[in-house]
Structures are given as C-alpha cells and as structure tokens.
Amino acid sequence: KKKKKLCYLEALKSGTTCVMDMFRFMDRCADAAGEIGLRVNLAPYVADQPGKDFFATRDENKRLIKTRHGSQQGRIKVWMGLEHLFYCSEDAYRDAVRCQREYGVRIHTHACEQKEEEAAVLAHFGRRSIGMLDHYGLLGENTLLAHCVWLNDDEIKRLADTGTAIAHCPVSNAKLASGVARTPEMLAAGIALGIGTDGPVCNNSLDMFEEMKFASLIQKATRLDVTALPADQILRMATIGGAKALGLDKEIGSIEVGKKADLVMLDLAMPNLTPHEVTNDGGNLLWNLVFAARGSNVSRVWVDGRCLIENGRSTQVDEARVLETAQQCGVSLYERCRAMSHLRVDMV
C-alpha cells in the first residue's frame, strides 16, 4: 500500500487521472487508490503454471472482483488479469473468458513484447502469441494487450477486426531493448490504442507528458519521417484513445456534456511553455502539450469533479509523509537486495 500511494501520487501530480494497474497485492492497491482519489483499473498478476505460485491465483482474482469492482463510487474497476502465455495454462485463459462474461469485466495480459519471446512462443506452442490468444478465445473488444511490439500485418488486422485494444509503452520498450511498436500501422487499422508507462520498474517515471513526447519521437527517428505520429494523434492516444482501450470512452477521455469531470490544468506561465498562443483553433497549445510540457507543469487535477491536486499539491494525503515512508521502505529493500548477491544483476 505504501508503494502504491507513492506511484498513484506521482501519476496524479503529473496529470494522469486514470490508470490500468497490473500488479500483486491488489486489495492494498484499491485502498491506496481510495486514499489518493485516482481512478484505477486493477488486474492481478495471475499465473497457475508450476513454479509461479508467487503470483496471484484465479480465486484471488474472482474474490477481488466480488469485493472491489465498482467500489469508491465506481472509480475502482477490477479486471481478469493473466501474466503471460508461459505463466498461465490454457484453462486459465479460458476461465478468464468465462469470468469476463459472467461478471461483466474486462481482461488484461501481456503479448509480443520481445523478439526472442515471440520465437520462444512459436517454438513451444506452434503458434505466435496473437494466434495462441485467439485460439484461447481471448481476443475481443473487452481485452487489452500490453506492448504488442512485434506484430506482423496479419496480426494487426486480426486485432483490429476483433476490437482488441493495445496499451503502447514506448519508454519501457526502449529501456528494455524490446523494440519499437508499429503504432502508425495500428492506428491506421483502427485499433484502440492508449499510451502507458508500464510502471517504475521498467520505466523509472510515471510522467505521461514524457511518454507522449517519446512515443512520437521514436517513430520519427526510426522511420526517418518527420510526419510520423504527429502531436494530434499522440494527444488522442493519451486521452480518448486510452479511455476507449479501457472501455471507458463513454465516461471519460474528453470534455463532453454527460461525461465525468476528470480534468487537468497546466500552468502556462513557465519557461518551457513560453511563448504560448491561445486562439480559437488552439494556437500552439497542441505542440506545447506534446513536445514541451512536463508533469511538473500540472497545477490542478480533478477526478470525478473532486479537486485532488491544488497548486501542485495533493488535497487528500500528506505528501511529505508518503515520501518519507516510501524512502524508508526503499532503503530497506535496497539493503535486503544487497544481501542476496547471488541474485544481483547489472543495473540498466
């Protein structure tokens, strides 16, 4: 819970109002989200293969749906979570599909993140990842796949045809040397595509402004095309695109009559956002938001009409206490890790 309060606070202070969170200890995550005020979709790391018992179980996932789904005035949603094809049995995938229909929830899992992963999946199962998920009945408009870096043309078409959504995590994919996802082709095919950070372990930051900028620049650089993934497409992916990927586009993701008041305000009187031009057609605000803004420019944030960040500070929790507690926990964790020299790996 202490770690999650830190993560949710960082996300909220940098202008994120809604997250998809796949992790363990989901009851504590729900409690932390309730305290911070963030809108959170929870998907437990579920695995049932031998040797993977440190992950959550299917029974825990179902209990969480029954006890937490729709809590905090509807801000907490619980999904069926599945870690990966090598961690979950066929029965786990098919059970998730059954539960999705029975409980009216959604499904989240990882797919096609690394080139070596795809080769291993093909060698083990005789199909690529998307083919296996399709075989298990997982693809569809209620499923969100993380990463999808190594999709071919047929797989992009299949995901588009089934309405399967993708969480695009460009900084994580770059840091872990996973590759560069084919986001322009995904968008052209009509796939619901949102932008994600993947979390502090694989990214070191939860700043969506950083993620937006990098998502555009990595496409321009690798394609040698300055027009690739322009600012307007990026902003849509980070707002209404993400809402659609989460199945929440009727409630959030844009400022419209009847939608929830999830809003972010930036202080434009900052060096990195000056000069700025505000006109009826937007002026240079779009480019400033995507290529110049940072999470530290956020001054106010509302979720469900409640002001959770005022003048850059949380209105719900004692930030100093959250940081102090997280610092103590972090130092303790570092010390324990140093004692396990046989598990030590080079930091990247």
Q: What annotation goes with each model-predicted range?
A:
Residues G15, A33, M80, H110, ...:
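Divalent metal-coordination and catalytic microenvironments
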Residues T239-V348:
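Active-site microenvironment of metallo-dependent hydrolases
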Residues K115-R127, E155-A160, A177-M186, N203-K220, ...:
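Histidine/acidic-residue-rich catalytic or RNA/ligand-binding cores of hydrolases
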Residues M20-F23, W79-D95, A174-A177, A245-G247:
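Active-site glycine- and acidic-residue-rich loops that bind
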Residues H135-N142, P184-N272:
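His/Asp/Glu-enriched, well-ordered alpha-helical/loop segment
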